[in-house]
Amino acid sequence: MTPDHGPLLYEGKAKRVFAADQPDCVLVEFKNDATAFNALKRAELEGKGRLNCQISARLFEMLEREGVPTHYLGLAAETWMLVQHVDVIPLEVVIRNVATGSLCQQTPIAAGTELSPALLDLYYKDDNLGDPLLSESRLQLLGLISSQQRLEIEQLARRVNQLLLSFFESLDLLLVDFKLELGLNGAGTLLVADEISPDTCRLWDHRNSDPQARILDKDRFRQDLGGVIEAYGEILKRVQGV
């Protein structure tokens, strides 16, 4: 079922954004498209949009219950959610609890190393530039956010990390790392935006010791491991069971 909506405002790799009847709101449709390596690798996976939409909804609801402001307002259909309109800050906030992926490729840190405190990195959100990592000096040079906003972003991201870590741990899942996107609503409030799903989180299954079988996230697509929909379905099953 497709909810009533206005014109298409934006289409990204994984979602479409439409105007909504409600003021200061938009409707987000989650697509079945899977992409990796800045969309150099692509596929369409039936059911992926529904899974990511439903998982994101449950996680946004959990964060809201814990007092974390998000753009989420409610589900509009299986693959649609109603959210507050926000001015997205062009940064990807990445929090790493365990070393893996690009961190191990760029540093001598061994894969699997627990990072305490968690490592927080900011990346400039621009596919054409390859989403480069920003140093503090480059962040100031670009003038994307103020020093106060930088502090607020880090505090919010670390709070989200604590909540997600505990939540996933209760489901026998390890939150290895994840990406957050943030935005400002009309009142200037900093909100968690975009989505929180296996597309944006690395999640390992504590119930499985096999280094490949334990992967329940987008790395199954990146690494051609197969079983992407089954893995995402397992995440939704556990999240809904809480």
Swiss-Prot record:
Top-level taxon of origin: Bacteria
Presence of the UniProt keyword Nucleotide-binding in the record: yes
Pfam families reported in the protein's UniProt record: SAICAR_synt
Catalytic activity: 5-amino-1-(5-phospho-D-ribosyl)imidazole-4-carboxylate + L-aspartate + ATP = (2S)-2-[5-amino-1-(5-phospho-beta-D-ribosyl)imidazole-4-carboxamido]succinate + ADP + phosphate + 2 H(+)
Keyword DNA damage: no
GO biological process, one term: cobalamin biosynthetic process
Biochemical pathway: Purine metabolism; IMP biosynthesis via de novo pathway; 5-amino-1-(5-phospho-D-ribosyl)imidazole-4-carboxamide from 5-amino-1-(5-phospho-D-ribosyl)imidazole-4-carboxylate: step 1/2
Keywords on record: ATP-binding, Ligase, Nucleotide-binding, Purine biosynthesis
Enzyme Commission no: 6.3.2.6
GO molecular function, one term: phosphoribosylaminoimidazolesuccinocarboxamide synthase activity
Family per similarity comment: Belongs to the SAICAR synthetase family.
Protein name: Phosphoribosylaminoimidazole-succinocarboxamide synthase
Gene symbol of the encoding locus: purC
